[in-house]
Amino acid sequence: MKKTYKINEIFYSLQGEGYNAGRPAVFVRFSGCNRRCPFCDTRHESGVEMTAEQIRQAVEKADSGQNTMVVLTGGEPTLQLSDEENLFPYTSSRRFIAIETNGTGAVPSWIDWVTVSPKEDVPLDKLPKFNEVKLLFDETRLDYIQLFNRDGIIAFIQPIDRSGKMNIQETVNFIKQNPRFRLSVQIHKLIGIQ
């Protein structure tokens, strides 16, 4: 019996945040998460069981075979992924594979770009190797956020919505005082795309 993955949705859009913002991508949203973050905007419990081949076919269909970047997101994709099965094996038309993870699981070696959005209880030395970190700006997490304020780390700070009010000015002020950080806004939400 072939391994299946619980997939919430697969869609073609633009990456809306971080280092690859604005880049066309097919998003593969995995169901399930080991966190229950109050600010999460993802319905990560529902989904359809799919084999690796079905996922590859859906990705090809989503971008009409244009070979764009693939973003594995969730939920928490590392709960279902491993080195044992490469969802996108090397071929002549190899895609660039990115993952968005909370940093609590092992990232498969076949991933090209790792964006980690750690939660406060994940120590820096316990996170998987990553290319960029995305931190939600919360004044109660300043000590944790400052752990990423060092050379060699691409760190994005993102304002959060609390009771319908974004903390944009506080986020901007923090970045101006800590210039190693970069601002990340959810472009896809600003321009009204998925």
Label for each model-derived stretch:
Residues 1, 24, 46, 134-136, ...:
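Short N-terminal micro-motifs specific to bacterial/archaeal maturation
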Residues 1-27, 31, 35-39, 182, ...:
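Flexible, acidic/Gly-rich N-terminal and inter-domain linker regions that tether
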Residues 3-10, 14-17, 32, 55, ...:
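Residue-level signal for well-ordered alpha-helical segments
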Residues 5-9, 24-25, 36-111:
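Conserved Radical SAM active-site core
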Residues 27-30, 48, 117:
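Solvent-exposed, non-transmembrane amphipathic alpha-helical segments
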Residues 29, 73-74, 186:
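A secondary-structure boundary/capping signal
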Residues 67, 78-194:
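Conserved AdoMet/S-adenosylmethionine-binding subsite of the radical SAM
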